[in-house]
Amino acid sequence: MAAAAPSSVTDFSESDNAGISREHWKIMLISGMGFFTDAYDLFIIGVVMALLKPEWHVGKLEEGLVQSTALIAAAIGALLFGRVADMLGRKRIYGVEVLVLAAGAIASALSPNIWWLIGFRFILGIGIGGDYPVSATIMSEYAGKAHRGMLVSMVFAMQAAGLIVGPLLAALLLTTPLSHDWIWRILIAFGALPALAVYAARRRLKETPRFLKAAAQEEDASGNLQRASHFDQKTHSVSFWDGFHRLVDDKKTLVRLLGAAGAWFLMDFAYYGNTVSSPLVLSALSGDHTILAKTLTQLGIFVIFAAPGYALAALTMDKLGRKTIQILGFGMMAVTFGLLALIPNVEQLFYPFLIIYGLSYFFTEFGPNATTFVYPSEIFPVRVRTTGHGIAAAMGKLGGFVGVFTFPFFMSWNGLAAAEGAAAIVSVLGLGVTAFMLPETKGKSLEELSEQPETPVERAVA
């Protein structure tokens, strides 16, 4: 079955060529709050486990499950919410994911034992995963082609705030007389607040004109934000599995799906393993480090290296292009991870270690962590856009699951060299996937992207 024919490129020419408006900034902020919680939780769960292990006598299996269960659930959430948003519309589903996320965070904070915590983190993960395809696609479908990359990447860049607030709040709480039991519960519960804060605003957002047009609505939806608020579900009834079939039946679309999903899987393997296991990595520097000292060190790394990487990615996304940034990022990740793996006793060289480790964060953010989020919001036809993004995000979370679950075992097997060596290898693979399977999308409308020149792999399978 061939992919759906693209709409005329003139249908949305006015909105495609428009500048950035207040409406765009509002949508960006509303869409980004879920990613604050995503990154916040990604960091603080490492701190939480450091606090819980001596109190609950947590073994390696339980530790791995606590840190990785939310990632498996996020894969399910991305698939589910992504498909439903293509079936019923972005508006109908938007906001439900943050309620699920908040419920999971609050319930996790009330957990009486490790197994309840694992179960509630599964609920949290469903909400986190559901946010990926819907938020990215809403921002992409509203943005003009000249600024789309920046706006979508800025939605994702809200992670930077979560990565900074997480260790900052943890450090503040660790200086108080509160018990560790109270501290970890407060840390987890706090993640629900940003998500709940944008629930009402998400429910008020109007349906994207591109979805209305593709769903063959009777109203004119060519870029008019004010009128793009209603659509009749009865006019669009499709099978849940229809979108998946449309993605895999067209060879060109399938190659792009494999490229986007493969690159995201490889990136998240390295990224999540490194970030969630950061207390283990920093312990390699000094066995005497307290939880507070390691938390402050991680905060410094995020502020100095990760946050500028997010910012630079957003500012250059529409200038350098997605493909250039992703190839550069994967390449430099391979170099930095490789240095950490190959330099003898690198963990004993405090400042060189921190600089190299920090640069790995910088080029992850100014690299595939941003672009793997942007790509799937652009390269698929509108009727399967959130479905495609959901599949790619799910593969990313699956890669994160593998990284989180295996990273501690790499560390215990052969120390830092094994863990960082594995991250370097998958970074090289990610570079190859990007170079041969993904197109450049900068400066093109979403409708044009269905007709742009093929990649080498797309030509080979045509």
Write out the residue ranges for each language-model feature.
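Transmembrane-helix signature of 12-pass secondary carriers
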Residues: 1-462
